[in-house]
């Protein structure tokens, strides 16, 4: 007997869309006035590190094709869309002169999105620092904080008549981990002291942007986007539970608590103090963080954080790394995306929703990224279309968990998939495809995948049957 399908209907006004970023989609055109970013510089000196040596200069050519791409937003059922302004495009040197071509470009993009009846969210920073500032120490240098504050104010002044919903930073912990505790973001060094200072300076910059936004546009909403992941211990043994708690302090609460609550977790401060890793800060700066919390929260969720107690302690003279507090745990029998290697754990989204409800005042939030990267997706091409049923299933199964959380009072207002059109993903370039729309790298032709048409039906009916 065929099992009857269940209807998952979402609240009226629930928003459906996707997220992308400037550096991953726009590309560079000769004469566009864009300055080099940290990624442009890194690619120029070490292109072999990038998959198939594809760098940030071409990406998905949104700069040239934005009108057609925005029409595709409508065709795939978007009611909300998040993109980012590239700081080095708008202010090529990071400070000083504004690039008028960038102003024209972004105003036209924003106007076209709004004209389609799509709610627009604009992010100010998606890992792309003007290289001129990186040369002077980047986020280790407080001067970058003040430069970012000026950049944010410039954006609010130039585009505030079009944009009323803003993001300060996307996943700010990622450059900290990958650039200062690893080798996946420039400047590629392992320096715990620098990592902590970069994290603190980024949070201060975010709080200053919130302050500036509220002063210039009191009716606007501003947020930060965090890759929030609950930490799951290997076992209930005290040492594993402690490792999970510390992992969550570093990976999530280091930005979540100051952004939403205005304070740093006492245990995190204590750990940093004990390790002689406290950043340079002032009482006035802590007041800025305390008094300028976000209006809502953006949540990115891909996979769970599974950890276990550390197997080794720090030896004298060794650089301090997070492995002395917790180690990754590879859980046997987990469900895995075979095309990407990441664990798929849909209840993680439900756990995040309940955490926000119970510990963060049930703050309003959006899922700002959730998606499935697939290597070699052309293997699923049939009848001129990528038959990505696996992506549809991935989205459905996460939405079931979100629907459950909404039924229990979670304050989530929308779901934004990563991503719209297959985009450039940093060192991985185009290795893994995430889009509702396929991109042919040779011709730059866009073709809606099966999931794109399914997503439109999801949006139009505000729910699905499964």
Model-predicted segments: where are they?
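Aromatic- and Gly/Pro-rich amphipathic surface segment
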Residues: 36-71
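Glycine-rich, proline-tolerant flexible connector loops at the mouths of alpha/beta enzymes
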Residues: 85-98
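Catalytic domains of carbohydrate-active enzymes, especially glycoside hydrolases
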Residues: 65-86, 291-296, 359
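Short secondary-structure transition/capping motifs
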Residues: 55-62, 95-99, 144
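Generic alpha-helix structural propensity
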Residues: 61-68, 76, 85, 101-108, ...
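Active-site region of glycoside hydrolase catalytic domains
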Residues: 2-50, 93-95, 103-466
């Amino acid at each position: 007997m065929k099992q009857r399908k269940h209807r998952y209907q979402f609240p009226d006004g629930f928003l459906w869309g996707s997220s992308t970023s400037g550096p991953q989609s726009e590309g560079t055109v000769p004469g566009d006035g864009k300055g080099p970013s940290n990624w442009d510089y890194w690619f120029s000196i070490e292109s072999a590190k990038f998959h198939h040596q594809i760098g940030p200069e071409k990406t998905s050519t949104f700069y040239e094709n934005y009108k057609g791409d925005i029409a595709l937003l409508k065709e795939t059922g978007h009611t909300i869309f998040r993109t980012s302004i590239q700081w080095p495009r708008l202010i090529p040197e990071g400070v000083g002169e504004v690039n008028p071509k960038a102003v024209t470009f972004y105003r036209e993009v924003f106007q076209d999105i709004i004209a389609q009846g799509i709610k627009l969210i604009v992010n100010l920073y998606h890992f792309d620092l003007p290289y001129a500032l990186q040369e002077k120490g980047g986020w280790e240098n407080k001067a970058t904080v003040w430069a970012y504050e000026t950049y944010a104010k410039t954006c609010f002044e130039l585009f505030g008549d079009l944009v009323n919903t803003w993001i300060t930073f996307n996943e700010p912990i990622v450059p900290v981990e990958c650039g200062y505790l690893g080798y996946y973001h420039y400047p590629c060094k392992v320096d715990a002291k620098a990592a902590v200072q970069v994290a603190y300076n980024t949070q201060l910059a975010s709080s200053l942007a919130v302050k500036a936004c509220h002063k210039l546009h009191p009716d606007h909403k501003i947020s930060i986007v965090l890759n929030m992941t609950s930490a799951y211990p290997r076992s209930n043994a005290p040492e594993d539970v402690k490792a999970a708690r510390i992992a969550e302090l570093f990976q999530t609460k280091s930005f979540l608590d100051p952004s939403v609550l205005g304070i740093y977790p006492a245990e995190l401060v204590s750990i940093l103090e004990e390790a002689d890793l406290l950043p340079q800060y002032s009482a006035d700066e802590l007041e800025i963080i305390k008094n300028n919390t976000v209006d809502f929260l953006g949540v990115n969720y891909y996979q769970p954080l599974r950890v276990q107690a550390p197997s080794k302690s720090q030896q004298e003279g060794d650089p301090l790394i997070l492995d002395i507090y917790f180690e990754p745990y590879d859980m046997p029998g987990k469900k895995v995306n075979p095309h990407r290697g990441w664990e798929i754990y849909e209840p993680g989204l439900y756990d995040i929703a309940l955490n926000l409800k119970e510990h963060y005042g049930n703050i309003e939030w959006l899922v700002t990224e959730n998606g499935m990267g697939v290597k070699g997706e052309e293997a699923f091409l049939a009848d001129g279309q990528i038959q990505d049923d696996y992506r549809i299933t991935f989205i459905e199964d996460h939405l079931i968990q979100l629907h459950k959380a909404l039924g229990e009072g979670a304050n989530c207002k929308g779901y934004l998939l990563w991503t719209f059109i297959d985009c450039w993903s940093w060192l991985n370039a185009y290795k893994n495809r995430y889009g509702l729309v396929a991109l042919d790298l040779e011709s730059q032709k866009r073709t809606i995948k099966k999931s794109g048409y399914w997503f439109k039906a999801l949006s139009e009916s505000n729910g699905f049957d499964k």
